[in-house]
Regions:
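Glycine-rich beta-alpha loop elements in corrinoid/cobalamin-binding modules
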Residues: 64, 80-210
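Catalytic cores of alpha/beta
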Residues: 159-168, 323-324, 396-412
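N-terminal [4Fe-4S]-dependent radical SAM core
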Residues: 20-23, 57, 185-225, 267
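A solvent-exposed, charged loop/short amphipathic helix patch at secondary-structure junctions
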Residues: 24-55, 104-131, 356-365, 445-455
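N-terminal pre-triad scaffold of radical SAM enzymes
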Residues: 5-8, 206-241, 254, 258-262, ...
Length: 544
């Protein structure tokens, strides 16, 4: 293999360095342990290896890495994204390896749910640990000056596992929006031989403006393109709302669309916390901006989806502007007959919405939330748009009545094509303990909610899978997915609330036994400066 003359390498483990067979939602399988299938087959389905060039550069890479790559290249640094299978020879010669991840240690949902329900380590955690062990081994034996920088949306997880910070010889943890300012600043310090902070927090005041966000230089996984950053809704449990709400200008979006189209990519994803709020001020839909965005996207992509959209925005857009109908008329044709995206229901309890997430219902009231959810699902079903919706189980102060209100809402949603995925609320502090899973205490009503959601999702998944993966190309994957769904449905139909609770307790016991068998990690001799305090470290306004 030929090697590039570079100073910095960007990488991530196999569960993210993949195109998931061109189907982004298949990637959610990497948040689970192998179930029913052996690990190699599970990974072939969920995370096949991408094509690489003669230097080990993947043809497609996660969008976040592409943004960091573009930022460093524009500032004159020698950098490349390298596939993990081709990483080792680069580690022997580069000055730094930079890793970005959505869920380093499987602490985020739905990884923590799968881990909790099965008692087995999800594959994303397994592959991340293997990657970090490789990096640490090379640093220890062949390149002691190598700097290891970890960043990305899940960088916070390193603060809860200081033993891994030590074991994997991590030099700097970067939390917050880091790609445009903090990472180039760190890169320059490395070249200048200056000391790196062990922990760097990039606060909202240091978030880049849209002018400072670069256009990517290489293809992203599944043609994903960012259209907005931040969220104006202000839910208590979500960190995204802390970031300023910004919209990427259409000319930058078009440059990234054109890049993909010129390389034969004609299917993709528009990424934002709420695509329907593109061009909006606050939560007030801007229909002209949304229509222009979709007309532009359709010019380059034959088919595409949204990463996320809010249910209250769906209702507002249709009630006020008939926008969902207008979008359906614009984008659906012989190449595209449905659109999928993620969204959040979180709860069917108006009381919890009022307390924790008033903005989720805006411009409507928390009291209206269950009706807003059902109306949104009805609108989406009518227009062949398919939501994958999350619920949060075990919010602080949640009562039995709150859970039953959520069960009632899920029952109302049965007629509508959708996936509904319940997620466990885990207090952040619990992750400091290896027995974090003991903090999750399920009650009978929680188990009933899990059972109802599973049956709902399996029912609709059997229909959706044919739309999502049509044709001979996907026949093997489609067959494997249907086999798995049949197995899951068999178990779900036989399950009761009592058996589910028993299953979860068995999983906890299994996890506890696994922890007891692991060799004891040496105690950290000295606290990592800044790790526990999480105090902001100021980043220069302009990195040079």
């Amino acid at each position: 293999m030929k090697l590039l003359d570079i100073d910095f390498v960007l990488t991530v483990d196999r569960t993210l360095m993949t195109d998931h067979h061109g189907k982004e939602f298949i990637g959610f399988m990497t948040t689970a342990p192998p179930v029913f299938f052996p690990e190699k087959l599970w990974m072939w389905i969920a995370a096949p290896k991408p094509k690489v060039d003669e230097y080990g550069r993947p043809v497609v890479a996660p969008y976040g890495l592409r943004k960091v790559e573009a930022s460093l290249l524009e500032k004159g640094f020698k950098v490349a994204v390298i596939d993990p299978d081709y990483l080792e020879p680069y580690l022997e010669r580069v000055k730094a390896v930079m890793i970005g991840h959505h869920d380093y240690f499987a602490f985020c949902p739905p990884s923590s749910e799968w881990w909790m329900l099965t008692g087995r380590e999800p594959v994303n955690r397994r592959y991340l640990l293997r990657l970090m062990r490789l990096i640490a081994r090379v640093k220890k034996t062949r390149n002691p000056d190598l700097k290891v920088i970890v960043a990305g949306p899940a960088a916070w997880q390193w603060l809860y596992v200081p033993d891994y910070v030590d074991e994997f010889m991590v030099d700097c943890i970067v939390e917050g929006e880091s790609g445009e300012k903090a990472i180039p600043w760190l890169a320059q310090r490395i070249l200048d031989g200056e000391e790196l902070p062990r922990y760097l927090y990039v606060g909202p005041a240091d978030s880049p403006s849209v002018e400072e966000i670069p256009v990517i230089k290489g293809l992203s996984v599944n043609g994903l393109i960012e259209v907005s950053r931040g969220c104006p809704r202000g839910c208590k449990f979500c960190s995204v709302t802390l970031r300023p709400f910004r919209h990427i200008p259409l000319d930058k979006i078009e440059a990234e669309l054109r890049l993909h189209a010129e390389h034969g990519v004609h299917d993709g994803i528009l990424h934002a916390e709420d695509v329907l709020l593109y061009g909006a001020v606050g939560v007030n839909v801007n229909p002209d901006a949304v229509l222009k965005l979709h007309a532009l996207t359709k010019k380059y992509y034959k088919s595409f989806g949204w990463s996320h959209a809010a249910l209250a925005t769906v209702v507002q857009a249709q009630r006020r502007f008939k926008l969902i109908s207008r979008l359906a008329d614009m984008i659906f044709d012989e190449h595209m007959d449905f659109l999928g995206f993620q969204t959040g229901i979180e709860t069917g309890s108006p009381r919890l919405v009022e307390r924790d997430m008033r903005g989720k219902a805006a411009p409507y009231t928390p009291r209206e939330w269950p009706d807003i959810v059902e109306e949104a699902f009805s609108i989406l079903h009518e227009h062949n748009m398919i939501p994958a919706a999350t619920l949060i189980i075990g919010l602080p102060g949640e009562t039995e009545d709150d859970v039953y209100k959520t069960i009632e809402l899920v029952e109302r949603l049965k007629p509508y094509r959708s996936m509904i995925i319940p997620l466990f609320f885990v207090p952040m502090g619990a992750f400091r303990r290896k027995d974090w899973f003991l903090s999750i205490q399920l009650r009978e009503e929680h188990a009933e909610l899990l059972r109802i959601c599973l049956l709902h999702s399996i029912r609709w998944a059997k229909e959706i899978i044919g739309k999502y993966m049509p044709g001979l190309r996907y026949a093997p994957v489609r067959w494997a997915m249907r086999l798995f769904l049949a197995w899951a449905e068999y178990g779900a139909r036989r399950a009761t609330a009592e058996t589910i609770l028993g299953f979860v307790e068995q999983a906890k016991e299994r996890m506890a036994r696994q922890e007891a068998r692991e060799p004891l990690v040496k105690r950290i001799k000295a606290r990592i400066s800044g790790v526990f305090g999480r105090q902001p470290v100021e980043v220069p306004a302009r990195a040079t």
